[in-house]
Regions:
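Feature marks extracellular polysaccharide-active and adherence modules
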Residues: 5, 14, 19-21, 29, ...
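Serine/threonine-enriched low-complexity regions in disordered or flexible coil/loop segments
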Residues: 9, 37, 45, 58, ...
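A composition-driven surface/loop motif
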Residues: 16, 26-28, 41, 60, ...
């Protein structure tokens, strides 16, 4: 604590904060001209005046009150009424204050604050961005225009200040010096309608703060943006220097015909003129090391970056230097840069291809201007189309020997576009593009025709209104998607149904009720092989609970491996009639089934989930005589599949795609059995044939946020299976009358026909389609069944476990059965 006591006042500073005693006011005195509403403060320092005491009567002065508003009053006014001000001129004065309190003559027009005669004033502002350094009697911000005269200085903010430092201004014209001394990008924010450097001695230093200027005019002098961010609506660059080191500067528009200032982009700095989407991502893809910085980003030390979404035409004296080593004088390593355009090692120029036509992105003022591009300088040409010529720079002197970089790995564009930089004697730097074949760049990709056509027809556009083209274009642009994610993302979306195991799960749930029917009609399912049993003439009612779990792995899908895990559960209920049929017994019946399940992808596709429901019906019949049994069935099964697939969030498309797919199976089969009874085991060889027509309906793959990506045509597979096997069983009768029959069945199941599904896919708006075949089942599988059935009187129960195995697939199932004989 510091105390200064005299006979008139007690002044207390506690932890840097002024404690004004009751009845005291901090004031500065000015001389007013009522005719012009001009108030002049000359050689003043704030004083603390007691109640009833004028500014002249106080001899307690304090030059620094950054936490206090200072009232501008008449020197002899004991009431300390605010002076009416239209123009406030401060000369020969040095002091710091939070702000000045005045009575504005015209609130709409505001007040002009004019610093002259070597004044050095520091003002802080308030807590919000609409605060002011001039306020009225109610502490409301007064619109403030500022002129900092040659030799004078205005400082906004204090680097060591603990509080927020914010204010808005009208026009601020700097002929002397303006310093923004910030204490952080979030806590120091100043906004300007216009910020203008208009004198050769003008110096503007914007440090550790966030700056917003609707208009900035650079005529003379220097504007230095240091460890700060600046957002400029319109820049009028007719002279002077704009130096950035390190900082982020965003310039929405350029006014005037030419760029007559020197733009020096220094160490770690980023300047964006116009707008380029996802610029920070592009910087990373080009090999720089960006890091978020306020409302923008900077790059690593030793790097520098300029992004042009609008063309720049250099005027007389205009210059662009992008090099981490440049200083505010425009020299690198102490040597002044003589070129009108200079791009150093580890610099990055990002150019929107839309401005790289005609005179190009950067146009020289005359052939006397030179351009240098160092060997390790990089160029990112955004959204370039194939078979085009893009002008990066034009109008310079001979560029053939001074432009070394911007080629090879230092030239970045769309993945399916070849680009070559050409620097010629005509003073231009151009990039010529040709199309790469998708199948060459990405062997095994599923949609090469679609990609080649889109690129060849120059349809690629990362902001296209066509969702499919936008998706494909973004997947091919490095800033949206890492190289290793391109094929999984494109192929997964183009093969959504296959990635979600639609065909496989449809076949599996269609086969489950067939297995239940065949078990029900099998000789091996008759618990009693001698005498009366449940299968005498009359009506049987039976039901099975079914559960299945199937795993598929390592199916080839172009350059990817595909697989999925599928689980389902459901039930089958049936009824049939047994009757005499010549020398044997005949049976006919009807069964219904229903269930639900889900499939989750595994392997290289992006994560895909299929939630499905299924239902079906079967007509079946059989004929048996002694040890011979023939079973036949005709069935229909329908599935509804709800598919969702994750896509990388970096695409900016809400991270998910979806599709609804209907699928079905019509199946017919015949199975013949022959039972050989022995005292030890009953041995029953069996053979069969089964036909399946597997249909996958056409569907549309969409973004979860809306918009069609792909249309997939319907497909019909014709599959034949030829199971051959043997069943081993034995009936055991207990003293209580229960009959127990354990059994085991082993089969081999060859398959023929369309064991692969055909996928025909196209993107709406692209005049091409792609076709591919993907395996759904192996050509040979092995089937094992193990179970037990118990029966007493007219009731039978059963429990079974089955397993299917092949090279790429493993399935397991559990059935629980019940039958009642009427």
């Amino acid at each position: 604590m510091f105390e200064l006591e005299n006979e008139k006042a007690l002044l207390t500073l506690l932890n840097g904060t002024l404690k004004v005693q009751e009845g005291e006011t901090v004031v500065v005195s000015g001389t007013a001209d009522p005719a012009t509403n001009k108030v002049t403060l000359s050689g003043v320092t704030p004083v603390v005046a007691k109640s009833g005491e004028s500014a002249n009567d106080s001899d307690v002065t304090i030059a620094s009150v950054p936490d206090q508003l200072v009232r501008v009053v008449d020197s002899n006014d004991e009431t300390k009424e605010l002076q009416t001000v239209g123009n406030l001129e401060i000369g020969k004065s040095v002091f710091n204050a939070k702000g000045l309190q005045v009575a504005p003559a015209d609130a709409a027009a505001g007040v002009v604050l004019n610093l002259v005669d070597n004044s050095k004033i520091t003002l802080i502002g308030g807590e919000t961005e609409d605060s002011g350094v001039l306020v009225d009697g109610n502490n409301n911000a007064v619109k403030t225009h500022v002129v900092v005269g040659d030799g004078s200085a205005l400082q906004l903010g204090m680097a060591g200040n603990a509080g927020k430092q914010m204010a808005s201004f009208g026009t601020v014209e700097v002929q002397g010096k303006l310093d923004v001394a910030g204490n952080g990008l979030d806590t120091t924010r100043y906004g300007y309608e216009e910020l203008k450097a208009s004198h050769a001695n003008a110096e503007v230093n914007l440090s550790n703060a966030s700056i917003l200027a609707s208009t900035a005019t650079l005529e003379k002098g220097a504007v230095n943006v240091l460890n700060a961010t600046a957002h400029i609506g319109t820049l009028n660059p007719t002279g002077g220097t704009l130096f950035i080191d390190p900082a982020y500067v965003k310039i929405e528009n350029l006014s005037g015909d030419t760029f007559g200032s020197s733009l020096l982009v220094g160490d770690g700095s980023v300047v964006e003129i116009g707008s380029i989407a996802d610029l920070q991502t592009k910087a990373a893809e080009a090999g720089l090391n960006p890091a978020a910085f306020g409302n923008g980003f900077t790059v690593a030390s030793g790097e520098s970056m300029l992004a042009l979404g609008k063309a720049v035409a250099l005027g007389a004296g205009g210059k662009i230097v992008v090099d981490a080593g440049v200083d505010k004088s425009g020299a690198i390593g102490g040597v002044p840069v003589g070129d009108s355009a200079y791009f150093g090692n580890k610099s990055l120029l990002v150019v929107d291809s839309a401005i790289a036509s005609g005179d190009g992105a950067i146009r020289a003022n005359s052939a006397a201007d030179t351009i240098t591009v160092k060997k390790d300088a990089k160029l990112y040409l955004v959204d370039a189309k194939a078979n085009g010529t893009y002008t990066i720079a034009s109008g310079f002197g001979n560029t053939s020997s001074t432009v070394e970089g911007w080629n090879g790995d230092a030239l970045i564009t769309n993945r399916l576009v070849n680009a070559e930089r050409i620097a010629g004697t005509d003073g231009s730097v151009t990039v010529k593009t040709t199309a790469k074949r998708a199948s060459v760049l990405y062997p095994g990709i599923s949609i090469p025709n679609t990609l080649d056509r889109m690129i060849g027809d120059k349809q690629n556009d990362v902001n296209s209104g066509n969702a499919g083209i936008k998706f494909l274009s973004r997947a091919l642009e490095p800033q949206f998607l890492a190289e290793g994610d391109v094929i999984p993302t494109l192929d997964g979306a183009a093969q959504l149904a296959y990635a979600g195991g639609v065909q496989s799960s449809t076949i599996t749930v269609a086969q489950a009720p067939v297995r239940a029917i065949q078990d029900h009609l099998s000789l091996a399912g008759k618990v009693a092989q001698k005498g009366t049993n449940l299968h005498e003439n009359g009506f049987d009612l039976w039901a099975n609970a079914i559960y299945g779990s199937n795993r598929t792995r390592d199916f080839s899908a172009g350059s990817l491996d595909a697989g999925y895990n599928s689980d389902f559960a459901g039930g089958v209920i049936g009824g049939d009639w047994t009757f005499d049929a010549g020398a044997g017994k005949g049976r006919v019946g009807l069964a219904l089934n229903v269930g639900a399940g889900d499939t989750k992808s595994r392997g290289d596709f992006n994560s895909t989930k299929n939630d499905f429901d299924f239902w079906g019906m079967s007509l079946y019949g059989g004929w048996s005589m002694d040890n011979v049994n023939v079973v036949a069935d005709l069935g229909y099964s329908a599935s509804k599949n709800e598919l969702k697939q994750d896509i990388p969030s970096s695409l900016g498309l809400c991270g998910r795609i979806k599709g609804d797919v209907d699928s079905s199976v019509i199946t017919a089969g015949v199975k013949a059995e022959y039972m050989v009874k022995t005292d030890v085991l009953d041995v029953m060889p069996h053979v069969g044939v089964r036909y399946m027509a597997v249909k996958t309906d056409s569907f549309t793959t969409k973004l979860d946020m809306g918009g069609d990506l792909f249309h997939t045509d319907s497909d019909l597979q014709h599959v034949w299976q030829f199971p051959v096997g043997v069943n081993l069983s034995k009936t055991i009768e207990t003293e209580s009358g229960w009959k127990v029959k354990p059994q085991a069945d082993l089969s081999v199941v060859p398959a023929a026909g369309d064991t692969k599904t055909k996928i025909d896919v196209r993107t709406p708006g692209v005049n091409a389609s792609d076709s591919m075949k993907r395996r759904v089942m192996d050509t040979t599988s092995f089937d094992g069944v193990f179970g037990v059935e118990v029966q007493k009187d007219n009731v039978s129960f059963g429990l079974g476990y089955n397993i299917q195995a092949s090279e790429h697939q493993t399935g397991q199932g559990v059935t629980a059965s019940f039958m009642y004989k009427f």
